Amino acid sequence: METKYLKINPADNVAVAIVTLPAGEKLTVDGTEITLSEEVPAGHKFALKDFAEGENVIKYGYPIGHARTTKKQGDWMNENNIQTNLAGLLDYTYNPTSVTLDIPHKNLTFKGYRRKNGEVGIRNEVWIIPTVGCVNGIINQLAEGLRRETGGKGVDAIMAYPHNYGCSQLGDDHENTKKILRDMVLHPNAGAVLVVGLGCENNQPDVFREFLGEYDEDRVKFMVTQKVGDEYEEGMKLLRELYEKASKDERVDVPLSELRVGLKCGGSDGFSGITANPLLGMFSDFLVAQGGTSLSLIHISEPTRPLYIS
């Protein structure tokens, strides 16, 4: 039988429609037959009981607001009839709960790219990174040129990363740009990187080179467009050298403990808090139990299982 609704927590007094439910639909929830008084769109809530004005609406086991007016069992509960409980200042003390993961450790591996500095990438790409937004045009041309020459084979991707920064930046703003670009240049998913500068920007290529610290000079090349006669030809020459290196990289077995996964916020629809988020939470629990790392971006209104950061 098709599941048409989901009651997330035993304490909830609303349920979520998994598919659009028509008015008059009869559903049995916890042994009680409920008749919907109106159509309830997929992902939206309907009342499991009669609500008095001001009574809390419980979802995920916690109040998500209160009823603006009296509502009947089977009514569609939405932003028009639910009012937030938030008002004024809220006193809050962070009291973390210690949770033990009952997940056995397994000697698992994944196929990754071991870099010279010991870092591990899950992809092997050629990146073109500008020190300043003024060279965005040429880096896009270079990326397209290398894709045409290679047919996109030999590496996972050939990527240009244009941005609008690096020129006339000062202070912390300038330092933050440098830090972000440095982390990109040294990222283990980049098998080779061409850093392209103009020559007159605040983020001077020579200074940025020193800012990088130690790096593999066979895998990171620099080009300053004002110092070359033909920036396209010079850029392609450097990219061919970089591509030659990166295209010979091979995946090797890497302990799962070295895997780092970043979780990105999704569409934030009516289902993400009850489908994707819990699944990613369980995956993160497992990964962390193996010694790996999971970094999560979540909304308070879309809870997952406990997430841990190693």
Language-model features, listed with the residues they occupy:
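Extended boundary segments
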Residues: 1-37
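Alpha/propeptide regions of enzymes that mature by internal proteolysis
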Residues: 14, 20-22, 41-44, 50-66, ...
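Short, glycine/charged-enriched hinge/interface segments at domain edges or termini
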Residues: 56-58, 63-127, 141
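Glycine-rich phosphate/diphosphate-binding loops and the adjacent beta-loop-alpha structural elements
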Residues: 124, 264-271
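Active-site glycine- and acidic-residue-rich loops that bind
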Residues: 272-278
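Mobile "lid/hinge" segments at catalytic clefts and subdomain interfaces of large enzymes
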Residues: 288-296
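Single conserved hydrophobic/aromatic residue that forms the stacking wall/gate
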Residues: 298-310
